[in-house]
Amino acid sequence: MTLAETFNTENHPNPLITLNYEPALESLGNDYYDEVTAAEFPQLTLRWRNDAILPRLGLDPQTVTDEDFITAFGLFQGRKPLLALRYHGYQFGEYNPNLGDGRGFLYGQVRGTDGELYDFGTKGSGRTPYSRGGDGMLTLKGGVREVLAAEALHQLGVRTSRCLTMIETGLGLWRGDEPSPTRSSVMVRMNKSHIRFGTFERLHYFQRSDLIKKLLDHVIEHYYQHLTHESDKYALFYAELVKRVAELVAQWMAAGFCHAVLNTDNMSITGESFDYGPYAFIPTYNPYFTAAYFDYYGRYCYIQQPSICQWNLEMLQVPLRAVIDKADMEAGLAKFNEYCHAEYHSLMLKKLGFEQLTTPEAEELLSLTLKFLQESQVGYHQFFYEMARTFSVKWRDEPGLVLSGSDIVPPSGTDANFDNWCVLYHKILNNFDYEQVKIIAQNLTYYNPKTSLLRPTIEEAWEPIVQEDNWQPFYDLVKSIQSRG
């Protein structure tokens, strides 16, 4: 019996296949993609289904079976064409014209209950014309890591893709950076768009200004609809993209997230975070923390992320000059640092409990916070969680009580940075009445969940899968993340 026969659902219409798919990108024509065929897998086991996002598709999780997920996203029944998107990109600063969807494709596009258009994009679904000698597959660990990254960032308020499902495929893969053979998976990502900065860069490489304008009109029509009827819609689009990207990277920085591979082909034209490879959350505040072992010179280290995103936006100006005036784009990009700074300060203040402070207070508090974190090497996430865990309205009245009872307090008088921070935090609290201080306590709890996705945490969920095929620690971790536990 074949796998298709095993998962025969003739008497049960598959709600994932009968969704009202829209041929939005397909309608642009084959200058932007290649039609491909999905790989066939020896064994399909559903390992993850994201019921939390099914209602956004108008689906009741109770009516969607595990077999529905496998049939739609493991056997890929009922959907054609499957589109491998074409793009180029700057990788570690060097232009690479040999890129494109090498192990995935656009499965389809669906209008959500919120009226927004969403992509279903696969990862690990087999070879395409852009596989560049690779097998087109995704390791199981790679799938696990992307599920965790997307859910963690979403709960932290970062604008991110989500994983709709992850299916183990029964293949053994050989990888230089994992014990091999290693298990394999296919994953389906749901986000606004898989159109990348590199999509436009490829069209410029082939001197197709007509296709650049056509694609830009498509992007504005579907993802910047409010600009459609503006006379200067193209310049306004770029200015808004700058703002979205600046705020996104500020969200990463506040979350302590290091993307690791900020090539232009990994930058979404909607300003979303997606495509998670060797990412990491910083264990301590080390500005030069680098997540990818192959980033030898620290190009994509934690502190460089804003400047790299700004550089990527500058590189995007080159193809967009076919449509948008250079001066207009430069004016838009000039506001990047302002947007990034404002978003980062707002988010960091919230992590410290405050909705708003005077500019001098905010600057001094953030400066002292980062100075203490960097010089003490206290855990970045631990510091903020300990603030939330031990906070008391009594801190308002007595500076000696600030962070008392936490696991991070240095011996009295041994850390001037910590002492100065406590005095300032107490002083700021004195500007608030008791009811306002209670709101500060609520903010601390909300913005600093207990669970942090550090690498040891991921390994603790992964090792039982490797050793015993025990998925419960993984499910428990996802549940803890989603519940902000």
From Swiss-Prot:
The active site is at 265 (proton acceptor). The keyword Oxidoreductase does not apply. GO terms for molecular function: AMPylase activity; ATP binding; magnesium ion binding. The keyword Lipid metabolism does not apply. ATP binds at residues 100, 102-103, 123, 135-136, 189, 196, 275. Keywords: ATP-binding, Magnesium, Manganese, Metal-binding, Nucleotide-binding, Nucleotidyltransferase, Transferase. Mg(2+) binds at residues 266, 275. InterPro entries: SelO. It is an enzyme of class 2 (transferase). Coiled coil: none annotated. Its cofactor is Mg(2+); Mn(2+). Its EC number is 2.7.7.-, 2.7.7.108. It holds the Pfam family SelO. It catalyses: L-seryl-[protein] + ATP = 3-O-(5'-adenylyl)-L-seryl-[protein] + diphosphate; L-threonyl-[protein] + ATP = 3-O-(5'-adenylyl)-L-threonyl-[protein] + diphosphate; L-tyrosyl-[protein] + ATP = O-(5'-adenylyl)-L-tyrosyl-[protein] + diphosphate; L-histidyl-[protein] + UTP = N(tele)-(5'-uridylyl)-L-histidyl-[protein] + diphosphate. HAMAP family: YdiU_SelO (MF_00692). PANTHER family: PROTEIN ADENYLYLTRANSFERASE SELO, MITOCHONDRIAL. Belongs to the SELO family. Nucleotidyltransferase involved in the post-translational modification of proteins. It can catalyze the addition of adenosine monophosphate (AMP) or uridine monophosphate (UMP) to a protein, resulting in modifications known as AMPylation and UMPylation. This is Protein nucleotidyltransferase YdiU.
